[in-house]
Swiss-Prot record:
Post-translational modification N6-acetyllysine, affected residues: 196, 202, 243, 250, 289, 295, 304, 435, 440
Cystine pairings recorded for this chain: none
Region (Critical for association with PPM1K): 145-160
Residue span, Peripheral subunit-binding (PSBD) domain: 172-209
CDD domains: lipoyl_domain
Family to which this protein belongs: Belongs to the 2-oxoacid dehydrogenase family.
Name of the protein in its database record: Lipoamide acyltransferase component of branched-chain alpha-keto acid dehydrogenase complex, mitochondrial
GO BP, one annotated term: branched-chain amino acid catabolic process
Presequence boundaries: 1-61
Variant or mutagenesis effect after changing residue 105 to A: Abolishes lipoylation but retains normal interaction with PPM1K
Organism: Homo sapiens
Location in or out of the cell: Mitochondrion matrix
Length: 482
């Protein structure tokens, strides 16, 4: 009996020590009703002792966390809040979309890192948010088993837990992606996600659409190949793109932001560069014929084939011969860096303003590869979903002003690049061949600008002549393709 009493006394003291140790390691503790609990941290014995059950604040009612705007790279310090995907009181899970923000370079979707309830939004639409400052307050979810007795909580095997997670897992996708899928009658369960943890991205939906039969309605070949004859000059009436704004008699002042703010910064730096201009005329008659032959083949692969892939590939072949045009200079023009990759930018006119995504590594891409990438960039650009990667890292730029209707331009270099080309519209103009015969020629004008601090006129002229020869005689490109 003495031995039993001694063991009971030792056990009671040990239990108190364990309680005290547990109490000291748990901050912000609440006291609940007395209960029996087994401290599983000591496997050598099991001990049940009446005491006040302990629980942390976070486990009791959830902890409010300030979700801050993290660094999104490229030296971006502030962004504009363009759209909220949540409101106060909404429940969110990890990787759910919180909002869409726009910097001076790209639009970015911010996703949650926590499971919980939105308690506060710090910004209204079009407000400026700063990196490192709170975006929202999220009350994290309390643990469901935190109020249960540890002794009575059944252990779940690893296999059972895994099975329940897989069975109950929901498809990961942002509201914008779900909306796009719904508009095109696509079941998200049929789409393979390429994002983190199988998240379905907008590119996955677009790729799924391209692979489906009839997902992209083909235009009538007759309409494309045999366009209706143009109206006489005297009957041509300019069509207004949009209605003129109604004059209210009041001036309106608003801040410059988004892509327009980026243009202010870039163009201000660009105009410090001494520009050298060079113009030429390109006969694209043979290229027009070649494209008409290749369009049905590209269309069968689900790709729209424009002239731009040929322009980009010809430029890349020219840059191999004149690498100084694929270079960049530092701010004070003390050092020049010759770029190994040909990341050729394409100026695009969008509702948000001028953006310049670029096709990466054109030097190792085929015409079809370039066309595929251009299709992707154009689709993402039309819905303002281009990533920062798509919009940065350019080494050379082409601006297709002719798609709007221009013939000549004076393009402005995008620093730190050293050259840019502007392409005019293609027009049918009478020209003489080598026999002196008049024929219908497809003429396009090109306007080049180069940084005259490092590029001389002869270099720009030789590059343009080489680029011109590839386009006027497309078969020549076959000799240099790699």
């Amino acid at each position: 009996m003495a031995a039993v009493r001694m063991l009971r006394t030792w056990s009671r003291n040990a239990g108190k020590l364990i309680c005290v140790r547990y109490f000291q390691t748990c901050g912000n503790v609440h006291v609940l009703k007395p209960n029996y609990v087994c401290f599983f941290g000591y496997p050598s014995f099991k001990y049940s002792h009446p005491h006040h059950f302990l629980k942390t604040t976070a486990a009791l009612r959830g902890q409010v966390v300030q979700f801050k705007l993290s660094d999104i790279g490229e030296g971006i310090r502030e962004v504009t809040v363009k759209e909220w995907y949540v409101k106060e009181g909404d429940t969110v899970s990890q990787f759910d979309s919180i909002c869409e923000v726009q910097s001076d370079k790209a639009s970015v979707t911010i996703t949650s890192r926590y499971d919980g309830v939105i308690k506060k939004l710090y910004y209204n639409l079009d407000d400026i948010a700063y990196v490192g400052k709170p975006l929202v307050d999220i009350e994290t979810e309390a643990l469901k088993d935190s109020e249960e007795d540890v002794v009575e909580t059944p252990a779940v095997s690893h296999d059972e837990h895994t099975h329940q997670e897989i069975k109950g897992r929901k498809t990961l996708a942002t509201p914008a992606v779900r909306r796009l899928a719904m508009e095109n009658n696509i079941k998200l369960s049929e789409v393979v996600g390429s994002g983190k943890d199988g998240r379905i991205l907008k590119e996955d939906i677009l790729n799924y659409l391209e692979k489906q039969t009839g997902a992209i309605l083909p235009p009538s070949p007759k309409v494309e190949i045999m366009p209706p004859p143009p109206k006489p000059k005297d009957m041509t009436v300019p069509i207004l793109v949009s209605k003129p704004p109604v004059f209210t008699g009041k001036d309106k002042t608003e801040p410059i932001k988004g892509f327009q703010k980026a243009m202010v910064k870039t163009m201000s730096a660009a105009l410090k560069i001494p520009h050298f201009g060079y113009c030429d005329e390109i006969d694209l008659t043979e290229l027009v014929k070649l494209r008409e032959e290749l369009k049905p083949i590209a269309f069968a692969r689900g790709i729209k084939l424009s002239f731009m892939p040929f322009f980009l590939k010809a430029a890349s072949l020219g840059l191999l011969q004149f690498p100084i045009l694929n270079a960049s200079v530092d701010e004070n023009c003390q050092n020049i860096t010759y770029k190994a990759s040909h990341n050729i930018g394409i100026a695009m006119d969008t509702e948000q303003g001028l953006i310049v995504p670029n096709v990466k590594n054109v030097q190792i891409c085929s015409i079809f590869d370039i066309a595929t990438e251009l299709n992707r960039l154009q689709k993402l650009g039309s819905v303002s979903q281009l990533s920062t990667t798509d919009l940065t890292g350019g080494t050379f730029t082409l601006s297709n002003i002719g798609s709007i209707g221009g013939t000549f331009a004076k393009p402005v270099i995008m620093p730190p690049e050293v050259a840019i080309g502007a392409l005019g519209s293609i027009k049918a103009i009478p020209r003489f061949n080598q026999k002196g015969e008049v024929y219908k020629a497809q003429i396009m004008n090109v306007s080049w600008s180069a940084d005259h601090r490092v590029i001389d006129g002869a270099t720009m002229s030789r590059f343009s002549n080489l680029w011109k020869s590839y386009l006027e005689n497309p078969a020549f490109m076959l000799l240099d393709l790699k």
